Swiss-Prot record:
The gene is proS. Catalyzes the attachment of proline to tRNA(Pro) in a two-step reaction: proline is first activated by ATP to form Pro-AMP and then transferred to the acceptor end of tRNA(Pro). As ProRS can inadvertently accommodate and process non-cognate amino acids such as alanine and cysteine, to avoid such errors it has two additional distinct editing activities against alanine. One activity is designated as 'pretransfer' editing and involves the tRNA(Pro)-independent hydrolysis of activated Ala-AMP. Homodimer. One of its GO terms (cellular component) is cytosol. Keywords: Aminoacyl-tRNA synthetase, ATP-binding, Cytoplasm, Ligase, Nucleotide-binding, Protein biosynthesis. PANTHER family: MITOCHONDRIAL RIBOSOME PROTEIN L39/PROLYL-TRNA LIGASE FAMILY MEMBER (PTHR42753), PROLINE--TRNA LIGASE (PTHR42753:SF2). Its EC number is 6.1.1.15. PROSITE patterns: AA_TRNA_LIGASE_II. This is Proline--tRNA ligase.
Length: 573
């Protein structure tokens, strides 16, 4: 490849609306151009990276026995209505009507369509297992698209769907895909971690997320450094405390706390540790009889885990109560709420840590007052107890093999055990060995192809630009001739190196644009090509050229006769 026949368009400064490193660098490197909110053109440099990501994904999916197909981006609403996701997905599902007023969805995933294929094509257990996959454009109508391609509205995704005859078969398919994902991310050359996760809106019984580790990641990854335990924050269990609850030592007292509405303010005013305070979170569950009010109690230095809260029996699809609902149920505005002297019946759920507390402080359901010396059993009934909080560093690992630590990650893949969630609702069945009708057991497996680009950059960059892992770099090597248009010797040697690397199967580009050295070097460091060879008259007089890896602090002088072998050795070809 010659740079003069390629398209390179770099910027010295990132656009003002670029917020995170990957967005800034992709815009500056000319990888993407913004077309609209959350919608981007993928320019030639960016598309080359996407194609390399796709090729690795495709090779490993084929190796794992999956079969590629392609499903429509526009899908009939009737299929989504069969599973209930037409209504459940909410506004992030882009809906449209054709000229005949028929409803359609612009796919964010394709569970319904692939299940429709399976129910029409698979009749017998002899046709199972099967795993279909596609690499296809998806659309999610994000309320606030941001961070470039990391949270865009249109994106490319690999989604796969397995169909098995029983739960044991599903487990094998799931493990097969899990192993394939490990190989994929290892081949990408990225530091990653697979973590236990919640299934969310997809539904099903079990799942893992694959996260690229990056300090700028928006997701918290919980792991135990002395074991294999890893989970995302939503799924990480906060274990019950081992110690028994201490006996009361204080009397219940209603204490004046003027205008102290936050737990931190109350703790400071009363001179007690923050962890002796309990914060009250009021939820509402809408029923046919009206809104049912729930009070969740969390230690003041902890945070509510909404996914865990939604799994409390009776709290699925909860919402946060309005201020009017709060005043009506507690007789007090927010800031002074607690589980004692409530105005109306309220279901109280305490986090495991709160249920283990004694002599604690909480709101008195009266403006400017809090209770101190509160104790379960003596001052109020024992609560419903559940794991409601996010774990924190230092908590005991759920596998009992150490304590937890937390790092940041960017989710780029997800595997789910769906079970019969879709096959039963869409009547996707087969006949087993005994001639009996059975629902197919399903799994689904996604990789955010375009999101990989942003995640890789967030993990691999410096002050000069992107540092691509070799496997997904737009080019493996760039040959930079200084004076290509002025020196026959430089041109001849640069062309020779370029040709020999091409013949060896190296993905190489020669910069024949005639740019000044500073501009040329800055462009390729920004774009992030991992290996660079510089050819110049001064070096050639000594029989040398310069080699420098993108992460190297200094260039290495290499004999002209050895440079191709040296570069091939660096990239393993």
């Amino acid at each position: 490849m010659k740079a003069s026949q390629f398209f390179i368009s770099t910027l010295k400064e990132a656009p003002a609306d670029a917020e995170i490193v990957s967005h800034k660098l992709m815009m500056r490197a000319g990888m993407i151009k913004k077309l609209g909110a959350g919608i981007y053109n993928y320019m030639p440099v960016g598309l080359r990276v996407i194609r390399k990501v796709e090729n690795i994904v495709r090779e490993e999916m084929n190796r794992a026995g999956a079969v590629e197909l392609s499903m429509p981006v526009i899908q009939p609403a009737e299929l989504w209505q069969e599973t209930g996701r037409w209504d459940k997905m909410g506004p992030e599902l882009l809906r449209l009507k054709d000229r005949h007023e028929r409803d359609f969805a612009v796919q964010p995933t394709s569970e319904e369509v692939v299940t429709d294929i399976a129910r029409s094509e698979i009749r017998s257990y002899k046709q199972l297992p099967v795993n279909f996959y596609q690499i296809q454009t998806k659309f999610r109508d994000e309320r606030r698209p941001r961070f470039g391609i990391m949270r865009g509205r249109e994106f490319t995704m690999k989604d796969a769907y397995s169909f098995d005859r029983d739960a044991e078969g599903l487990k094998k398919s799931y493990e097969n895909m899990y192993d394939a994902y490990v190989r994929i991310f290892q081949r990408f050359g990225l530091e990653f971690r697979a973590v236990a996760a919640d299934n969310g809106a997809i539904g099903g019984s079990g799942s893992h997320e694959f996260h690229v580790i990056a300090d700028t990641g928006e997701d918290a990854i919980v792991y135990c450094p002395t074991s294999d335990y890893a989970a995302n924050m939503e799924a990480a269990e906060a274990l019950p405390l081992v110690a028994e609850r201490a006996a009361p030592t204080q009397a219940l007292e209603k204490t004046f706390t003027p205008e102290k509405v936050k737990c931190e303010q109350v703790a400071e005013f009363l001179g007690i540790p923050l962890e002796r305070n309990v914060k009250s979170i009021v939820l509402a569950k809408d029923t046919e009889a009206g809104a049912e009010i729930w009070l969740l109690l969390i230690r003041a230095d902890h945070e509510l885990n909404e996914v865990k809260a939604s799994k409390v029996p009776g709290l699925a699809d909860f919402r946060f109560a309005t201020e009017n609902e709060i005043v009506d149920a507690f007789g007090s505005p927010p800031g002074y709420l607690g589980p004692i002297d409530m105005k109306k019946p309220v279901k109280v759920v305490a986090d495991r840590t709160v249920a283990n507390m004694s002599d604690f402080c909480c709101g008195a359901n009266y403006r400017d007052y809090h209770f101190t010396g509160v104790n379960w059993g003596r001052d109020l009934p024992e609560p419903i107890v559940a794991d409601l909080r996010n774990v924190v560093a230092g908590d005991a690992s759920p596998d009992g093999k150490g304590t937890l630590e937390i790092c940041r990650g960017i989710e780029v893949g997800h595997v789910f055990m769906l079970g019969t969630r879709y096959s039963e609702s869409m009547n996707a069945t087969f006949l087993d060995e005994n001639g009996k009708t059975q629902p197919m057991q399903m799994g689904c497996y996604g990789i955010g192809v375009t999101r990989i680009l942003g995640a890789a950059i967030e993990q691999n960059f410096d002050e000069r630009g992107i540092i691509w892992p070799a496997a997904i770099a737009p080019f493996e090597v760039v040959v930079c001739p200084v004076g290509y248009d002025r020196s026959e010797a430089v041109k001849a040697e640069a062309d020779r190196i370029h040709a020999e690397l091409l013949a060896a199967g190296v993905d190489v580009i020669i910069d024949d644009r005639g740019e000044r050295p500073g501009v040329m070097f800055a462009d390729w460091e920004l774009i992030g090509v991992p290996h660079r060879v510089v050819v110049g008259d001064r070096g050639l007089k000594e029989g040398k050229v310069e080699y420098q890896g993108r992460r190297d602090a200094q260039a290495t002088q290499v004999a002209v006769a050895d440079v191709v072998g040296h570069v091939r050795g660096q990239i393993g070809k």
